[in-house]
Amino acid sequence: MAVEKTNSSSSLAEVIDRILDKGIVIDAWARVSLVGIELLAIEARVVIASVETYLKYAEAVGLTQSAAVPA
């Protein structure tokens, strides 16, 4: 996949359209410790994509119901 470079600026609508078309995953992990004792751990994975994009990639990795049921 090649990175496209343009000299013109993109509008917010173009950016949102590209994110929904391609999808984006934000994976975050944080830990709060005091004197070596873990007080709080947070893990988060946020997926932003259109329903069509999600279903296309979820089916490819076997996350949909139709992919889970053997034929």
Curated annotation (Swiss-Prot):
Function, in words: Gas vesicles are hollow, gas filled proteinaceous nanostructures found in some microorganisms. During planktonic growth they allow positioning of the organism at a favorable depth for light or nutrient acquisition. GvpA forms the protein shell.
Compartments (UniProt record): Gas vesicle shell
Key word Disulfide bond present: no
Cellular compartments per GO CC: gas vesicle shell; vesicle membrane
Organism: Microcystis aeruginosa (strain NIES-843 / IAM M-2473)
Name of the featured protein: Gas vesicle protein A
Family as reported in the entry's similarity comment: Belongs to the gas vesicle GvpA family.
Matching InterPro entries: Gas-vesicle_GvpA-like (IPR000638), Gas_vesicle_GvpA (IPR047870), GvpA (IPR050530), GvpA-like_CS (IPR018493)
Classification lineage: Bacteria, Bacillati, Cyanobacteriota, Cyanophyceae, Oscillatoriophycideae
An example Gene Ontology molecular-function term: structural molecule activity
UniProtKB keywords: Gas vesicle
Quaternary data: The gas vesicle shell is 2 nm thick and consists of a single layer of this protein. It forms helical ribs nearly perpendicular to the long axis of the vesicle.
Gene: gvpAI
UniProt entry tagged with the keyword Zinc-finger: no
